[in-house]
Amino acid sequence: MLSTYGEILRLNRAWRFSAAGFILRLPMSIMPISIILSIQAAYGNYTLAGAVSAINIIALAVTAPMWARLVDRYGQLKVMGPVFAVSAVATIVLFVATLQMASPSILFVSAGIAGATWGSPGALVRARWIRTTDTVSQLNSAFALEAAVDEFVYIVGPVVATVLGTVLHPTTGVAVSIVFLSVGAALFLSQRSSEPIPLGKAGRGARATSDGTEGSKDAAADAKGAAASAPARERSLLLL
């Protein structure tokens, strides 16, 4: 199994966007607990801390499908570049507001914006695998690898957040999330060669389906296109 993963990671240097996607996903599991720890330490109020963290998560869940549709139409860099920038700025505002014990309304607004401008990094990575792999077997292995990465992120993230928030400073987890978001987004979006072709630019022959899935290769000539159309069709709605 490890040798199989090694083979697909070497396809067109796919390990580069996969590793960047891993970094980009880490804040998703670090932020919720970090928000609770930092706000509770500053305000001494678990109710406020839980509410702000909940707003962040709800905003993410509500807006992720919208960003997925826009990414399919206009491309990952064009859409998610500005979106990730706004998310980073909003998280910085949340970080500073917590340290300064600002009005709770600022916490709610900044946390909501930070979550609403997060999107679904896992779906972005999977879309690149669809473009990178050549066979259904390779695509299945790639998706299995990303599923393992998802599990690792969700297991390790809360542990990292707890250790950082208790051993160092309650706001450390939020600060680290800002770094991971900024670095991960820059590394991931800068890799243009693996970015899927937006539907707005793809020719009629490059469209595998009519429901928002782009076909990165000629669907009529490539057997993978027909066999992998089902998982590809779902990629825009894949949420971590």
Role assignments for model-derived ranges:
Residues 62-76, 165:
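Helix-to-loop junctions at the C-terminal end of transmembrane segments
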Residues 156-177:
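Transmembrane alpha-helix termini and helix-breaking/packing motifs in multi-pass membrane transporters
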